[in-house]
Amino acid sequence: EDERAFLGGVYYEAYKKMGAHPMVMNGVAGTHFAVWAPNAVRVSVVGEFNNWDGRALPMHKMPMSGLFELFIPGVKAGDAYRYEIKAKGDVLLQKADPYGNRTQPAPLWNSVVADVSDFTWNDSGWMAERKKYDDRRQPVSIYETSLGQWKSGKELVAFAKEKGYTHVELHPVMEFLEDGSDGYPTSAYFAVSTRYGTPAEFAALVDELHQVGIGVILDWSPAQFPRYAGGLEKFDGTPLYEVKDPEMAVHPMWGTMLYNYDSPMVMDFLISNACFWLEVFHVD
């Protein structure tokens, strides 16, 4: 059923299946990995836990969807990893996890296993009211900022509350490679940038803002992605996430790659990413 939804472009909770998820399976603690690479000959999970050896932990392919998955006992939150993808022609690629919830600090890009559910929320009142909120009939005052401009989240909360803002709009908090880009373009869509702390620390900021009656809006960049060795470009050796026509795939001004919106699986990736921030981190 998950495979059919994924192939149909309606798997809006793909983030619950894809990526790296610490769990206990049959009484054994470890991490479950899942990645989409339909044209790959082989996909392996590599990390310090197997000396970065792609021969050690090959993943199992689901033929209908091109998803690869594997449960690895003993792998835990904090362990760095990436995918070694053997493409056609015996080309070996090293790729970050598109659905990864944490990365090493830029300019490094290896993914890091993280448990983003490990946070206790205290904003139930806000979340209940959010379902009834109609911004077309309510006064709105939005403060736009970047987390990098603040020494601490508490200072931002205090400032926004004092000035009477109803919402805070944050420049992208997702991971990005270039320090001068202010978050554009995004390199890891499901990961809070290490520049801004841990997933739990970002969740705490959203929680505190909600508790004082302030909503959280995120800038989101689903139009383009950066070109780097571990990125989405030719992820399995073929144009998987980007526009298939090479003459149309690169943004003429910025040199970034443009998403292929005709692909249901790319739409899964982008829409589930929006749902991820709304559901997991309670953004508004």
What residue ranges belong to the model's regions?
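Substrate-binding/active-site clefts of carbohydrate-active enzymes
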Residues: 104, 124-142, 146-283
